[in-house]
Each structure stands twice: as C-alpha cells, then as structure tokens.
From Swiss-Prot:
Its main location: cytoplasm. Specifically methylates guanosine-37 in various tRNAs. One of its GO terms (biological process) is tRNA N1-guanine methylation. The gene is trmD. PANTHER family: TRNA (GUANINE-N(1)-)-METHYLTRANSFERASE (PTHR46417:SF1). It catalyses: guanosine(37) in tRNA + S-adenosyl-L-methionine = N(1)-methylguanosine(37) in tRNA + S-adenosyl-L-homocysteine + H(+). It comes from Cyanothece sp. (strain PCC 7425 / ATCC 29141). This is tRNA (guanine-N(1)-)-methyltransferase.
Length: 240
C-alpha cells in the first residue's frame, strides 16, 4: 500500500517510520511511505506556503498552489483517497482504519497547519477529511502519523500473528479484556485463577465478560452502540 504525506515537517516522520512494526512493514515493502514538502513546490524565491486570511483575522492559512502542485505530482493508483487531517473531519475509529486498509491502494495525507488550508483544497482536491477528535493540535503531522500507524498495522504481514488483530479493543465494538503475565503473584495481587486453569472455554467466557463489563463501565457510549448492534433475542446472553 502506498502512502504519500504532504507535510511541512518531513523530519517529524523519520524516527517513527524507522522503528517497530512500521519500520518492519516498510522494510518488507508491505507499505511505502513518501514525504512531500509543499515548500519544494513553490515558485517564489522565499518558498512561501502560507498567507493572510481573506476577510481578516488572526493566523495564517496554507496556500492552495503548493498543495495542489505536490499532490498533482504524484502517480494516481486506481483506488486512491486524498485525506486532509482536520478537526472538521469524520472521527477516526477502528472501523474507519479497517475500511481504509481494505479499500484503498494509495492514501495521500495532507497535514494541516496554522488556521488550516485554503478551502479550495478541501473543495477541489481532498476526497475525505479525518479528525482524531474534538480537540486542536499544533500540527497535522501527529494525526497523520496516527493514521499511518493504524492503517499499516492492519495490512497483511505487518503483525506477526493475524489472530492478534482479532482480539483487540474495538474490533467487535468492545474494549479489550485485561491481560496478565508472570509472575502469577505480584505484591499480593494474583492473576485471576481462571486464567491459570487451562480451561479454554472458561478463559474465553471470563474474557468476554470482562470486555462487556469494562466497556459498560469505561465507555458507556461504546457499550450502548454495541448493545444496539445486537439482535434483540440475544441481549439476555450478554447481561453481566
């Protein structure tokens, strides 16, 4: 899968893309990441990428010309999405990450800055806006890296054991169950006996119960959404 990131700070991505699972995925050519700096696509001697906002106001706006030029310099794969990381976008969640991983061969990711980008970029270049949540960050590189990380780890071959992806938070609409490792007793806090019992059916039942309880207690919004997704005749099977 190909990722093209339009960013004023390409060095921001150097270490994360060389480390951990992302680094391994790139080394195995599961994913390709290309970084484009809009300054390299300017035509003035100062390499200016921003200007004042029409109508006045505080803050600068990213100019359309360098962004269009950067994106238009790229090859176009058959299944391509041009994404702007923006507080105005749809909320990023696991389902959206999975959809991007499954349905596209190329993601062009534009990192916003300052007061944002010229609206003509949104209207005539971007095909989707994505937000991490209802808050504002200093730059678009942080959400862009989050998007890359979330999508790349879903690509076949990135995570060693495919089943690891099937037991994570949000895969089935619920939070993950608690995890424990050795020692069996730490400072008087023992690992639940059921996890040491060797009874796989009991372990699965315990984990499912923990998922439901944890989601209900910590994320009632997710819990209600999960309940609403269940067939009415199955609700009695999930009372905890």
């Amino acid at each position: 899968m190909r990722f093209d990131v339009v960013t004023l700070f390409p060095d921001f991505f150097t270490s994360p893309l060389a480390s951990g699972l992302l680094g391994k995925a790139l080394a195995k050519q599961i994913a390709e990441v290309y970084l484009l700096n809009p300054r390299d696509f300017t035509t003035d001697k100062h390499h200016r990428v921003d200007d004042e906002s029409y109508g006045g106001g505080v803050g600068m706006v990213l100019k359309p010309e360098p962004i269009f030029a950067a994106v238009e310099s790229l090859p176009v794969l058959p299944r391509r999405e041009v994404i702007l990381m923006s507080p105005q976008g749809e909320r990023l969640d696991q389902a959206l990450l999975q959809s991007l991983a499954d349905n596209f061969d190329q993601l062009v990711v534009i990192c916003g800055h300052y007061e944002g980008v010229d609206e003509r970029v949104v209207d005539h270049l971007v095909t989707r806006e994505i937000s991490l949540g209802d808050f504002v960050l200093t730059c678009g590189e942080i959400p862009a890296l989050t998007l890359l990380n979330g999508v790349i780890r879903l690509l076949p071959g990135t995570v060693g054991k495919a089943e690891s992806l099937q037991n994570e938070s949000f895969i089935d609409g619920l939070l993950d169950f608690p995890h424990y490792t050795r020692p069996a007793d730490f400072r008087g806090w023992p690992v639940p006996q059921v996890l040491r019992s060797g009874h796989h059916a009991e372990v699965d039942r315990w984990r499912r119960t923990q998922q439901i309880q944890r989601t209900r207690d910590r994320r009632p919004d997710l819990y209600q959404r999960w309940l609403n997704s269940l067939p009415p005749d199955s609700l009695q099977d999930f009372t905890v």
